[in-house]
Amino acid sequence: MDVGRHPQITLLAYSEIEDISGYIGNFHIKVRKKVRYVDEVECTACDECVEVCPVVVPKEHQLGLAARKAIYIPFPQAVPAAYLIDIEACLGFNPIACGKCLEKCDKKCIDFDDQDKTIEFDVGSIIVATGMDVYDPTEFDEYGYTRFENVLTSMEFEILSGPGGVTTGEVIRPTDRKVPKSIGFIQCVGSRCESRGSPYCSNICCMNTIKDTLLLKEYYHDIDCKVFYIDIRAFGKGFEDFYRRSKALGVEYIRGIPGDIREDPKTKNLILTVENTTNGEIEEHELDMVVLSVGLVPRYDASTIQRLLTLSTTSDGFLMEVHPKLSPIDAPTSGVFFAGCCEAPKDIKDSVTQASGAAARALTILSQDKVKIQALTATVDEDLCKFCGICADVCPYGAITVDIKAKIPAKVIEAACKGCGTCA
């Protein structure tokens, strides 16, 4: 919200980047500001339009656990605090078959004839902070996520247990709406596995589960919590103490990942079969609810940013930095920097730290009149150039332009060229 109020920050909410061109110190950005059908300046979020809207659809922000109307604010504390219309769900568009929100709005903020807008501007540097997605457990469904109602993901449990969630913070079972007496947490769902999901550790899952167990024990003292894990990775400042507090409150940590989950057809309880690797025994645990601690994966549209900025990705799909130790914030494209989980899975603390570093790196460019570049750059012999465009296609930095139709020889943008020799 501070960003929305800052006089020197322009916030383009509900927008998508369509094109990026240029180079360090001289990037040109084209943004499509998607139509809201509601004037975000005039709208006061009075809620009267929502009251008369007859359409009810699942609420994306709460993963479908709650409902919203066709006219809605995407999530609490959204900036700007103005409504928008889901035109695919709305009944009042082309032709107007409903129009109740239009009639109810006294300030006449709603305009069904509104259109997308294209905004273009120039910037000196770019910080990529696109975030991440969470692993979809339906991919293999080995833990019965699509078959058993009492199997939830960690994201769904977060919504269920949060004060702003569908139950205002009360943890209940989906099947009978009762507070569970026992909950099991299965770690590394979609992480640390070559055959199912991703081979890497998602960094945040262990501590997120430990936090959930502490909250459960704080509000439900007699609840039985069991955590099934491969390894507990409590490596950060204060993390080990957090882990020990959880164990001291009676949370049981079982070293082993369940190989099978069954549901009791009468009670809807879940029966987990697991090999406890600390004693080598096969155990069965009957639980009221199971939470899948799902891992982090690259955003579904990460390839778009990769293409627009001519970036590379690692084998796991996250954006690749110049050097993991010496330049962990810099992208191979000069003037572009990374912040947060676009580069690798990380928690809030590490994301904030990297974002601060990215802001500082961007300021080093903006505070200078001229930018130092590498002396070694490619050159084009215009007499020999055949205007084929192959050099421009293979350049990993987008540093070469060529007009094939007009037969204009290739030109190297020295500010973007790294002298790698790929074009040669």
Residue ranges and their predicted role:
Residues M1-A424:
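Residues forming the flavin
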